[in-house]
Amino acid sequence: MRYNQFSYIPTSLERAAEELKELGFDLDLQKTAKANLESFLRKLFFHYPDSDYPLSHLIAKNDMDALSFFQSEQELSKEVFDLLALQVLGFIPGVDFTEADAFLDKLAFPIHFDETEIIKHIHHLLATRCKSGMTLIDDLVSQGMLTMDNDYHFFNGKSLATFDTSQLIREVVYVEAPLDTDQDGQLDLIKVNIIRPQSQKPLPTLMTPSPYHQGINEVANDKKLYRMEKELVVKKRRQITVEDRDFIPLETQPCKLPIGQNLESFSYINSYSLNDYFLARGFANIYVSGVGTAGSTGFMTSGDYAQIESFKAVIDWLNGRATAYTSHSKTHQVRADWANGLVCTTGKSYLGTMSTGLATTGVDGLAMIIAESAISSWYNYYRENGLVCSPGGYPGEDLDVLTELTYSRNLLAGDYLRHNDHYQELLNQQSQALDRQSGDYNQFWHDRNYLKNAHQIKCDVVYTHGLQDWNVKPRQVYEIFNALPSTINKHLFLHQGEHVYMHNWQSIDFRESMNALLCQKLLGLANDFSLPEMIWQDNTCPQNWQERKVFGTSTIKELDLGQELLLIDNHYGEDEFKAYGKDFRASKAALFKGKANQALIDILLEEDLPINGEIVLQLKVKSSENKGLLSAQILDYGKKKRLGDLPIALTQSSIDNGQNFSREPLKELPFREDSYRVISKGFMNLQNRNNLSSIETIPNNKWMTVRLPLQPTIYHLEKGDTLRVILYTTDFEHTVRDNSNYALTIDLSQSQLIVPIASN
């Protein structure tokens, strides 16, 4: 374990003493440091009628237990404080450590003993994470140190778990959206699942916009998947034009219906544990799946601003600007009289994507988004540089396949009976509009590009993204984060994992940082919390996070690739082609070992190479035919210890998100030896070699200069490392699988790898 503490708010002595007193700690500025520490420790053992017993189980020195120490005349020292602090946080002498000083250095322990600062040290210790993954104060509250009185209690600028999660209100309302996406002449109704604590105070809301939450149709999804085996189409030379079109909602009328009291209820919904954490701290949770999902009406429009509007309508309802009904019969309306109107959205992948889309509407009431692994342009999710390009791990998927997966109205037999025929018509229109034949950008994709509206974002923004996420690739967060207005508060956590959540990792206090931010934004708490704009997980060692100023630098270093002419054959033998088509992982293994159809260049680094931004391959290339697909991957190659991309569980249920509520495992990325690490990758239809909107012809056997931008990253390579460049055509995981007989030739003498370099 290593501390990377970003959530602690430096506190004055007077404020620290006041907060400790509010928690029931009997500390006194007039007492000695030793007396205050003893009083603090005895309070920790509030379950015991006799605190001597648990105190005797701690050691103050290698040859003295804590009880004996406090009964002695010996003075408090750094050695004693450090040893007791470690034990209070769950570290066991002789098991987790033998030499406390060396262990504290390894931990990067954030508290440095000064006898005159003992009150502040105790305050800081309570806000520091235990070995279990919880802060000490959260651990104590979870054990019942504070009663669940359904009111707010704060410590170090963060809300504590004092809301009773055993007496939650679970209710359903149906919000009227200014849409008619299924063209039935009726405004669409949006089902909203609400979970909130009982409270006399208006509550802020965490809203998870999740098209998955009302169920998914995997059977329809699998039937809709596309075969990837097809020839690369030769496109006509042309210029693509699109236009920015404002979304115009339909008119709605003020509701004059009586207020209803009997709301639909539910017992369970698959929740997000970060939401659960905040539910116990006085934040209502709502789950909304939007148009075209079970319990709602409308068509699944998948990514456009009509779908976004169906979530926006819920925020409007929370602020009294939209109508909600008690049921589909629309006999009574219901008002969000429990809400304070301030909302933060949460969730990963499609969920985080909807958060980004919502933020670009500038809707009043949306105070903050926490968007994890989020899409900012749907074209860049299913296409790349004029190519059909599947998200990592999902060859054959496209946006209409996702529509089939999430149109959960068809999981309700009655809805299927009444609406499926019309749904299939709308789905066919969507399939035509996305133009899988060419892979080109068009109006359909432009209408699903949130980047063009980034300037309208006015809420606070928090993004997390994995630099090993080849599903929602790093370009998605790179482009939206760098497009955000300079006038807003923005934060980015870049980790070394894949498509994963990071709130329960051991090495980063993400939950606590979000707590401090949300108390500021949604509860109006003046806590003086300041979070760095960007925090990056160091790839060279375990559990190390660093502040960064920018994602993408203008300083570059050009690396020569060699002097040879390299030939890349596109065609595989029939058996090999079929085998790779059945198992794209086998093709990746062959590719990384240099056993596929490829050009391979190894560069031994003579100095450190700190990459920050978008690597570009500038290549002199020609094709034997009038078409060509170019793929590239950059590897950190050679055996050494690296971070894994999938977090592993260190414990099974050590994190309590309330008071014995929604327990979850503590996780972390492992640090272990492997043979390589993908740094970046990229794909291009050579007919789109100049830009996305220009379709060019490819002259047979004529040299072309191509600039292939790869996925942005921040990655530190060290002197002596090997940078492996792999150039090839078909990628069996991502691109169409064209097995026609053509070849690409690369002139390495006129080619470079252009690397953005991080400044010191």
From Swiss-Prot:
The keyword Hydrolase applies. Pfam families: Peptidase_S15, PepX_C, PepX_N. One of its GO terms (molecular function) is serine-type peptidase activity. It catalyses: Hydrolyzes Xaa-Pro-|- bonds to release unblocked, N-terminal dipeptides from substrates including Ala-Pro-|-p-nitroanilide and (sequentially) Tyr-Pro-|-Phe-Pro-|-Gly-Pro-|-Ile. GO terms for biological process: proteolysis. SUPFAM superfamilies: alpha/beta-Hydrolases (SSF53474), Galactose-binding domain-like (SSF49785), X-Prolyl dipeptidyl aminopeptidase PepX, N-terminal domain (SSF81761). One of its GO terms (cellular component) is cytoplasm. The active site is at S349, D469, H499. It is found in: Cytoplasm. Its EC number is 3.4.14.11. InterPro entries: AB_hydrolase_fold, Galactose-bd-like_sf, Pept_S15_Xpro, PepX_N_dom, PepX_N_dom_sf, Xaa-Pro-like_dom, Xaa-Pro_dipept_C, Xaa-Pro_dipeptidyl-ppase/CocE. Keywords: Aminopeptidase, Cytoplasm, Hydrolase, Protease, Serine protease. HAMAP family: Aminopeptidase_S15 (MF_00698). Removes N-terminal dipeptides sequentially from polypeptides having unsubstituted N-termini provided that the penultimate residue is proline. Homodimer. PANTHER family: COCE_NOND FAMILY, PUTATIVE (AFU_ORTHOLOGUE AFUA_7G00600)-RELATED, PEPTIDASE S9 PROLYL OLIGOPEPTIDASE. Belongs to the peptidase S15 family. This is Xaa-Pro dipeptidyl-peptidase. It comes from Streptococcus pyogenes serotype M12 (strain MGAS2096). The lineage of its organism: Bacteria, Bacillati, Bacillota, Bacilli, Lactobacillales.
